[in-house]
Structure formats: structure tokens, C-alpha cells
From Swiss-Prot:
<dbReference type="Pfam" id="PF00329">
    <property type="entry name" value="Complex1_30kDa"/>
</dbReference>
<keyword id="KW-0813">Transport</keyword>
<feature type="region of interest" description="NADH dehydrogenase I subunit C">
    <location>
        <begin position="1"/>
        <end position="184"/>
    </location>
</feature>
<dbReference type="Pfam" id="PF00346">
    <property type="entry name" value="Complex1_49kDa"/>
</dbReference>
<feature type="region of interest" description="NADH dehydrogenase I subunit D">
    <location>
        <begin position="208"/>
        <end position="593"/>
    </location>
</feature>
<keyword id="KW-0511">Multifunctional enzyme</keyword>
<comment type="subunit">
    <text>NDH-1 is composed of 13 different subunits. Subunits NuoB, CD, E, F, and G constitute the peripheral sector of the complex.</text>
</comment>
<dbReference type="InterPro" id="IPR014029">
    <property type="entry name" value="NADH_UbQ_OxRdtase_49kDa_CS"/>
</dbReference>
<dbReference type="InterPro" id="IPR023062">
    <property type="entry name" value="NADH_DH_suCD"/>
</dbReference>
<keyword id="KW-0472">Membrane</keyword>
<dbReference type="GO" id="GO:0008137">
    <property type="term" value="F:NADH dehydrogenase (ubiquinone) activity"/>
</dbReference>
<dbReference type="InterPro" id="IPR001135">
    <property type="entry name" value="NADH_Q_OxRdtase_suD"/>
</dbReference>
<comment type="function">
    <text>NDH-1 shuttles electrons from NADH, via FMN and iron-sulfur (Fe-S) centers, to quinones in the respiratory chain. The immediate electron acceptor for the enzyme in this species is believed to be ubiquinone. Couples the redox reaction to proton translocation (for every two electrons transferred, four hydrogen ions are translocated across the cytoplasmic membrane), and thus conserves the redox energy in a proton gradient.</text>
</comment>
<comment type="similarity">
    <text>In the C-terminal section; belongs to the complex I 49 kDa subunit family.</text>
</comment>
<dbReference type="InterPro" id="IPR029014">
    <property type="entry name" value="NiFe-Hase_large"/>
</dbReference>
<protein>
    <recommendedName>
        <fullName>NADH-quinone oxidoreductase subunit C/D</fullName>
        <ecNumber>7.1.1.-</ecNumber>
    </recommendedName>
</protein>
<keyword id="KW-0997">Cell inner membrane</keyword>
């Protein structure tokens, strides 16, 4: 079956269409409802009773879908544009990736409000654990057979499920907040760790285990992040990562902001990524709108995104080396970051959170003298990377602390949804800029740095290589910056080019409406993933033909990377955990959203 197939034919790749044929052959075409979208992948609805069977087939098919990339839900109750889709009060989607096919597929399940139950997928993909917990936390959907279905982002005492459409979206819709001494005691008691709840023993045959809170304010936790460690001496027997302390409800806020006014919020997801955060969002909105941006816009966006990749990696490098005991390098990396920020501020007007990309372009054109600033940075940075590699990364103490530590292979990385440098350090050559070029990356020459041991040291070396390749990309942007407009000539470009508003009354009216109310995007779904600073980051947007998003799903790499911690570090020492945390490259805003 096909929903609204006459309205839009999705641009599937051959491998995407192949899996639809394979599914129809195995289960029968009547099993599926094919949903036309602008996601660029097959989207198929399946009956709940066939879900696990279909997911297992996709996990085991030749060239299998080895990665559960994302899993989340949608409250469908207020959605008006649903013609041809299965009746649903809520839905859950499973976004699966096959690296061998370089192909994705999305499986959806419709649920009635009276029966919000699904079988768990944790027996197929271990990383379904945290995603299912978050879906229960946000929507109240139960996953039967889940090993520990508890709150993920919200406090244990929280009432309600925030991403439901009938849940308040603004603080003014709640009673004024107060925290009495009794309530504070209640909240603290709720956070007390009980080993028995997690199947942990307090005693072994000949020893008593110690339970230690690492965080939520430990400097090596890199943010408000708590890991409960079960210890035998200094050996980690087991551990439980606990997140949510930095949760700000970013996906809920997207439902109350216009498509345009949500751009600054994207900056605050990975707050070290700057405009890199804007890119998947605006690309996804542009798919909804049918906007094709000028080539100059593509090149400007790539250049600024690579600047922020370098800024992120310099901070990572300095703090990583500091975590294992060397204090000096972090001061040098911050000095070099200042040089990069000088360029960023001159071009965008801001440093950490420029919010500079726009729907259909960028905020303004490159200023006079931008090329001189970029050239100065390109002349400075390569020799600094040489110094870091010689003085710090070849240091015998650092190598001793990190080589062979927190090691995992490609198979394990994919099972846990690991992407970015953490995946490429295992020898897996998968970088979206090469495998699935976006925003014009196919026009640039660069290499994908790889390592093969998958340990804490290799992850750092991959990041070093990425900085060199980012410099190479920026050099090409500098030498080959095309002429042309910095915004697309399209009715949904927001805001429209300023020059046009001064000449044409219709453009001025459009500007007024789009900035005050927001542009109206066609009803559909769109998706865009990018190779961000910490791994693959994506925005999956659902438009119901309004000025605001009906549903915004933000998939971040750090969420998946922290879930992997127990499988990697159990059996190691506390000192190895510190080196491992430093090698991951995460910020809690990226985890908690």
C-alpha cells in the first residue's frame, strides 16, 4: 500500500528500493504502508504484531542493517495531514542503517492511546535500551521485556510525559516552582542509588563492593553527568551512567518556535559546534521547502562548519591531555582557538553561538578582508598541530595511559550506534562527507583519517587527522569561493534578501510575515544527517503545514556514545575510565538536549 503516492515520489537510491522489494517478497506487500516523504529513505508502517519479525529480518538480511541509528516517538493526535496513513494516536519509528548498502530504512508502528505497548528491540540492538527508556519518559509508551524501563532525561519523581501534545510547553502554564526542605529531601532520596534495582550485588564471595558516585560534578565527567561505579578496590565491576541533568526540552521548544526562530536553539545542542549545529536543521527545512541554495552559500557553510570542527577538536585535545595529567597543552589549544574565533567573529559577528545560517542561505555575505584573516589562520595552524603531535601525543606517559585502553572493534561500535571518530578509530571508513555528500562536500578533495586499534589513543589521533583535513577543506574554500548571492531566490527563504525588500513591496510583506509569524512549510517529513564534530547529528522534521514544526527529532552522537560506556569499561580501572571519558568527546548539552 502507498499513502499519498500521487503527491510525492521519494527519490530512493537503488539500494533503498532493493530493501523494499526484499521486504515485500518476505512479508507480502500488504503488510506495509509506504509513506512518501522527503527524508530520502523508504518509510514503511508495519503492524505491531509483525514489528519484531520485520526488525529481525532487517538485522539479519544480507548486507544487514547493523545499526539502530535512532528510535523515538510522535504524538499523532493533533496531526491533520495524515491521509493514507494507518490510524494512530501515537507512533514509534525505528531508523536503521546499513553501511554495506550505504542505505537507510525507517520502520513505523501505529499505536492506540488505549494500548501503548510495544515489544522491546533490545534483544536485536543493545542500544535500543536508552532510546526506549527515553520514549517511555517522553510519551509513556511501554516496551515489554525491557530490562529497566525507568526515566531517562526527567527526574525520577517527575509527573507526566513532556512530549505529549497535551503536556504544557511553557513555564507560565505551570504553577510557580518552589522547593521546600521536605521536597528537597524527597528529590535527593529519589536519586539514591539502589544496587538491587540494577541487578548488582553488594557483596562478592570474599569481598564487599563499594559503590562510588563519579559526578554529577566531577571535573572528568565533562559536565553534569553521573556514573555510579561498582568497585572491587579500583577495578570497575559494573557501572550505570545517569544522564538528564542538562535536559532543557529542546525538542518540545521546537514545537513552539517558528521554523526561523528555532535556529538559535540549535546552537545550544552541541554548544561547541557553533554553526555546525545549524547545518542539519536548515538543510532539513530546505528539503521541506524545496529550496536549492546558491553554490556560494554551500561553500560558505562548509568553510564555517570546518572552522568549528577545528575549534571543537582543539578544546577536545587540550582537555583530553589534561585529563590524563598534562596541564600545559590546554593553555596552548585555547590560544589557538582564540585565533580561530577571531575569524569566526569577523565573519558572523559572534563567537560561540553565531546562529548564522538561515533557511535558504546565511545571515549576510562575507565581509571585506575575510580572505586575509582566513589566510593568516591557515598559515599559522599546521605547524601548531605538528607541535602538539610531537610534544604531547608522542609523550610516553600519555601513550602508556591510553594505548590499549577502552578498546572496542567495529562490530561493537555499530551495535551501540557509535559514529564519528569513535567509529573510524576502529578502521571503519565511514564519513558522511564522503559516503553521503551534502551541501557540496563532493566538490572538495580531502581524506578520511582512520586508525585500527579502537582505543583511547587512536580516537585522539583520528581527531588530529581531522583537523588537518579541515584546514585542507578551508584552503579550497578560500581559493575557490564562488561569486553570487548569499541567499536563495525562493519565496520561503527566511528572511528574504534585504536588498529585495527595499525595492519590492511584495518582498517586504513576505519579510514581515515570515519574521513575525514564520514561514509556512508544506506538510511533509524531511531528514538530514551530517558529520558533526562528535559524530553523526541529524534533524528529522515533521511539518503539518504550519509556521511551526509538528515534531522535531534531534538525534545526537553523544547520547549513543555514553550508552556504550559499561560495555567498554567494565573490568578496567578507574584511571582507565578517566582516559576513556576524555577520549569520547562529548558535552552534556549534546546528550541531554
Amino acid at each position: 500500500m502507498t499513502a499519498d503516492s500521487a503527491l510525492y515520489i521519494p527519490p530512493y537510491k537503488a539500494d533503498d528500493q532493493d530493501i523494499v522489494v526484499e521486504l515485500n517478497s518476505r512479508f507480502g506487500a500488504e503488510t506495509f504502508t509506504v509513506q512518501p516523504t522527503r527524508t530520502g529513505m523508504p518509510v514503511l508502517w508495519v503492524p505491531r504484531e509483525r514489528l519484531i519479525e520485520v526488525l529481525t529480518f532487517l538485522r539479519q538480511v544480507p548486507k544487514p542493517y547493523v545499526m539502530l541509528y535512532d528510535l523515538h516517538g510522535v504524538d499523532e493526535r493533533l496531526r491533520t495531514h495524515r491521509r493514507g496513513l494507518p490510524s494512530a494516536d501515537f507512533s514509534v519509528f525505528y531508523h536503521l542503517m546499513s553501511l554495506e548498502r550505504n542505505s537507510d530504512v525507517m520502520i513505523k508502528v501505529a499505536l492506540s492511546e488505549r494500548d501503548l505497548n510495544l515489544p522491546t528491540a533490545t534483544r536485536i540492538w543493545p542500544n535500543a535500551n536508552w532510546y526506549e527508556r527515553e520514549v517511555w519518559d517522553m510519551y509513556g509508551i511501554t516496551f515489554t521485556g525491557h530490562p529497566h524501563l525507568t526515566r531517562m532525561l526527567m527526574p525520577p519523581t517527575w509527573q507526566g510525559h513532556p512530549l505529549r501534545k497535551d503536556y504544557p510547553a511553557r513555564a507560565t502554564e505551570f504553577d510557580p516552582y518552589s522547593l521546600s526542605a521536605a521536597k528537597q529531601d524527597l528529590e535527593q532520596e529519589a536519586l539514591r542509588f539502589k544496587p538491587e534495582d540494577w541487578g548488582m550485588k553488594r557483596h562478592g564471595e570474599n569481598e564487599d563492593y563499594m559503590f562510588l558516585n563519579l559526578g554529577p560534578n566531577h571535573p572528568s565527567a565533562h559536565g553534569a553527568f553521573r556514573i555510579i561505579l561498582q568497585l572491587d578496590g579500583e577495578e570497575i565491576i559494573d557501572c550505570v551512567p545517569e544522564i538528564g541533568y542538562h535536559h532543557r526540552g529542546a525538542e518540545k521548544m521546537a514545537e513552539r518556535q517558528s521554523w526561523h526562530s528555532f535556529i538559535p536553539y540549535t546552537d545550544r545542542i552541541d554548544y561547541l559546534g557553533g554553526v555546525m549545529n545549524n547545518l542539519p536543521y536548515v538543510l532539513s527545512v530546505e528539503k521541506l521547502a524545496g529550496i536549492k541554495v546558491p553554490q556560494r552559500v554551500d561553500v560558505i557553510r562548509i568553510m564555517m562548519a570546518e572552522f568549528f570542527r577545528i575549534l571543537n577538536h582543539l578544546l577536545y585535545l587540550g582537555t583530553y591531555i589534561q585529563d590524563v595529567g598534562a596541564m600545559t597543552p590546554v593553555f596552548f589549544t585555547f590560544t589557538d582557538r582564540q585565533r580561530a574565533y577571531k575569524v569566526v567573529e569577523a565573519i558572523t559577528g559572534f563567537r560561540l553561538h553565531p546562529a548564522w545560517y538561515r533557511i535558504g542561505g546565511v545571515a549576510h555575505d562575507l565581509p571585506r578582508g575575510w580572505d586575509k584573516l582566513v589566510r593568516e589562520f591557515l598559515d599559522w595552524m599546521p605547524k601548531r598541530l605538528d607541535e602538539y603531535e610531537t610534544a604531547a601525543l608522542k609523550n610516553s606517559i600519555l601513550r602508556g595511559r591510553t594505548i590499549g585502553v577502552a578498546q572496542y572493534n567495529t562490530k561493537e561500535a555499530l551495535e551501540w550506534g557509535t559514529t564519528g571518530a569513535g567509529l573510524r578509530a576502529t578502521g571503519c571508513d565511514f564519513d558522511l562527507r564522503k559516503a553521503r555528500p551534502y551541501s557540496g562536500y563532493e566538490n572538495f578533495e580531502f581524506e578520511v583519517p582512520l586508525a585500527h586499534n579502537g582505543d583511547a589513543y587512536d580516537r585522539c589521533m583520528v581527531k588530529m587527522g581531522e583537523m588537518r583535513q579541515s584546514l585542507r577543506i578551508i584552503e579550497q574554500c578560500l581559493k575557490n569561493m564562488p561569486e553570487g548571492p548569499y541567499k536563495a531566490d525562493h519565496p520561503l527563504t527566511t528572511p528574504p534578501p534585504k536588498e529585495r525588500t527595499l525595492q519590492h513591496i511584495e518582498t517586504l510583506i513576505t519579510h514581515f510575515l515570515q519574521v513575525s509569524w514564520g514561514p509556512v512549510m508544506p506538510a511533509n517529513e524531511a531528514f538530514q544527517m551530517i558529520e558533526a564534530t562528535k559524530g553523526i547529528n541529524s534533524y528529522y522534521l515533521t511539518s503539518d503545514g504550519s509556521t511551526m514544526s509538528y515534531r522535531t527529532r534531534i538525534r545526537t552522537p553523544s547520547f549513543a556514545h555514553l550508552q556504550q560506556i559499561p560495555s567498554v569499561i567494565n573490568g578496567s580501572m578507574i584511571a582507565d575510565l578517566i582516559a576513556y571519558l576524555g577520549s569520547i568527546d562529548f558535552v552534556m548539552a549534546d546528550v541531554d538536549r
